[in-house]
Amino acid sequence: MNLVFLGPPGAGKGTQANLLTRTYEVPQISTGEILRAAVKSKTPMGVKAKEYMDQGALVPDSVVVGIVEERLASPDCASGFILDGFPRTVAQADALKQVLGALGKQIEHVVSFEVDKGVLLERIVGRRVCRACGRAFHVKFDPPLVDGVCDACGGELYQRDDDREDTMRRRLEVYDEQTAPLKSYYEGERLLRKVNALEPIEDVQRQIVKLVESCNG
């Protein structure tokens, strides 16, 4: 089972990927995590990535794709994998296709997490996190008993920079610019499957499992 998850920040890709890894016993692969792991382990591509990172420069596609290739060649990917948040562009999708071809693999399904941007913004902008214990709250959907105070430990609740409305709007704009062509690309490959990501976590999970198993069947 070789999957790609597409969706805007906050759509629940990571949560669903984590649940699927337990169901199907395949690894969840996040580019941010494997980039950090490659740098820490000093793999050939990790060493190259660190050179760019030390200069404060963006890690180029060629290196990112190389790190993804290193990860996909690992033994635990033999039965499948879930790519979470990669590829982000058509150029990366083309490179991924070549990498997988060289490994004798191919993408089976690209799951697109469909969300209403207004609802998504409300979800994310309302998040609050405890500085002390890390527990998460939501000002509307899961408010603390006392405004600004953690129910669990009494710590201060704050809004992360990534959850601020101006930041989220910029991230969503970038996502739309990059991903609209990518969705068209995968539609052309007949791999794109859409799920309603605004439903409860368990319902989204059922959608994905049903979709994957029906397509496999």
From Swiss-Prot:
GO terms for biological process: AMP salvage; nucleoside diphosphate metabolic process; nucleoside monophosphate metabolic process. It catalyses: AMP + ATP = 2 ADP. GO terms for molecular function: adenylate kinase activity; ATP binding; nucleoside diphosphate kinase activity; zinc ion binding. One of its GO terms (cellular component) is cytoplasm. Its EC number is 2.7.4.3. Residues 30-59 are annotated as: NMP. Zn(2+) binds at C130, C133, C150, C153. It is an enzyme of class 2 (transferase). Transmembrane segments: none annotated. It comes from the Bacteria. Gene3D superfamilies: P-loop containing nucleotide triphosphate hydrolases. InterPro entries: Adenyl_kin_sub, Adenylat/UMP-CMP_kin, Adenylat_kinase_CS, Adenylate_kinase_lid-dom, P-loop_NTPase. Pathway: Purine metabolism; AMP biosynthesis via salvage pathway; AMP from ADP: step 1/1. Keywords: ATP-binding, Cytoplasm, Kinase, Metal-binding, Nucleotide biosynthesis, Nucleotide-binding, Transferase, Zinc. Belongs to the adenylate kinase family. This is Adenylate kinase. It comes from Geobacter sulfurreducens (strain ATCC 51573 / DSM 12127 / PCA).
